[in-house]
Regions:
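Intrinsically disordered, low-complexity Pro/Gly/Ser/Thr-rich segments with frequent PxxP/GP/PP motifs
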Residues: 96-136, 223-259
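Membrane-proximal extracellular "stem/stalk" segments
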Residues: 178-315
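Beta-sheet-dominated interaction scaffolds and their linkers
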Residues: 34-68, 72, 115, 184-196
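Alpha-helical transmembrane segments
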Residues: 327-339
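Short solvent-exposed strand-capping/beta-turn motif centered on an Asx-Ser/Thr pair
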Residues: 65-70, 81, 135, 206-212
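Cytoplasmic C-terminal tails of single-pass
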Residues: 341-359
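Terminal connector regions
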Residues: 70-97, 125, 131-179, 257-303
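Short, solvent-exposed loop/turn segments enriched in Ser/Thr/Gly
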Residues: 44, 55-61, 123-126, 138-144, ...
Length: 359
């Protein structure tokens, strides 16, 4: 029997445990949402892809299912998607859109009951009324229907300081024609901010078109204007832009030196669908702004250091569990190796006996 065959039962146990954990994690959401697609649904995707006409009105129906033994409350929202700092399409309610956005999804969808009560082992239909714009538009409007489950009384009592929130989202895409729009980008404001307790420079890269732009390559450099010394560099290979959105391209002061006041120059390059966009723009960091950002970064770093110290103080149990798990793995490997050696010794002994018998 090979070593792999001996290990397979152990691997199977871990796979079963992982599968059980995944099922448990999905069940812990406490609810599910099932969209009902109308006749003007354009595709077989799992989200709403609706072809609409000017002034059209229709109902969108989503069934919320509660499979648990407890009554739950779910709040419903509709909003336009945006582009996250990570370079992905953000289906949460960040409200960061470009000035070219013609319509907010929240202005087109009315929710009669934004808070729905679903009894245990029951389901309820949520009805959202869609009213299309009076004027025609090219491209797409992309939004999200978010369903947020409120924590139950038991969850509130057992959560302590940390409260988990469970949400599910269904994308909604609205269009009036199949006209394809060319890609285009523009540069917006450049500011100094705080990102993950670090001073940073944020360049707003705009997608002013009513279309998605997936897999954009972006490269950014920041120079001191007078010395032309490069102080920041960032390269991203796969940026996804939501329609009519702003991507906050962020360069973080990872060394922790802070920002100096002065005049700087940003060079931004974008590549998409065989085209290249290049931007060169000066900006200033005022002394008061640099002082404020650096001070906030120091304060947040100190707070995080305190939290890490507290975590280290209560982590012996975690380390003990990790150590125990590692010990189990080591013992299993040792046993397998010993068993293999024993099998080899037995096989060698059998071969010797057979050889002697032949003589």
């Amino acid at each position: 029997m090979s070593v792999m065959k001996r290990i397979m039962p152990t691997i199977a146990v871990f796979l079963i445990m992982a599968l059980a954990f995944t099922v448990k994690a999905e069940a812990s959401m406490g609810f599910s949402v099932n969209p009902s697609f109308p006749e003007n649904q354009r595709s077989n995707s799992g989200f709403y892809d609706l072809r609409i006409t000017p002034g059209q009105e229709q109902d969108i129906i989503v069934t919320v299912v509660n499979p648990t033994n407890t009554q739950i409350a779910v709040t419903v929202e509709a909003f336009t998607v945006s582009t996250a700092r990570s370079g992905t399409v953000d289906y949460s309610n960040t409200r960061v859109n470009d000035e070219t956005l013609p319509h907010l999804i929240s202005d087109l969808i009315t929710i009669a009951e934004p808070r729905v009560i679903i009894p245990a082992h029951s389901e309820e239909d949520v009805i959202l009324k869609l009213t299309a714009p009076d004027e025609s538009f090219d491209g797409i409007l992309l939004g999200s229907l978010r369903f947020l489950r409120e924590p139950t009384e038991d969850e509130i009592e057992s959560a302590g300081a940390i409260m988990n929130r469970y949400a599910q989202a269904i994308a909604i895409r609205l269009s009036m024609n199949d006209r394809e729009l060319d890609a285009d980008f523009a540069l917006g404001e450049i500011t100094s901010q705080i990102t993950n307790a670090r001073a940073s420079i944020v360049v707003d890269v705009r997608n002013p078109m009513a279309r998605m732009a997936r897999g954009v390559r972006a490269e950014a450099r920041i120079f001191e204007r007078d010395s032309n010394r490069e102080i920041f560099y960032q390269s991203l290979d796969e940026v996804d832009f939501a329609p009519n959105s702003v991507f906050p391209l962020t360069m973080v002061d990872r060394a922790g030196y802070g920002l100096n006041p002065g005049i700087y120059r940003a060079e931004i390059m974008l590549e998409y669908e065989g085209q290249t966009w290049q931007f060169d723009q000066e900006f200033e960091i005022a002394p008061t702004q640099a002082a404020r950002v650096n001070s906030q970064a120091r304060n947040q770093n100190q707070q995080q250091a305190g939290l890490r110290a507290n975590n280290d103080a209560i982590n012996p149990l975690t380390w003990a569990m990790i150590g125990a798990g590692a010990l189990v793995v080591v013992v299993a490997i040792v046993l397998i190796i010993r068993q293999k050696r024993k099998s080899e010794e037995i096989l060698e002994l059998q071969q010797r006996i057979l050889a002697q018998q032949k003589r």
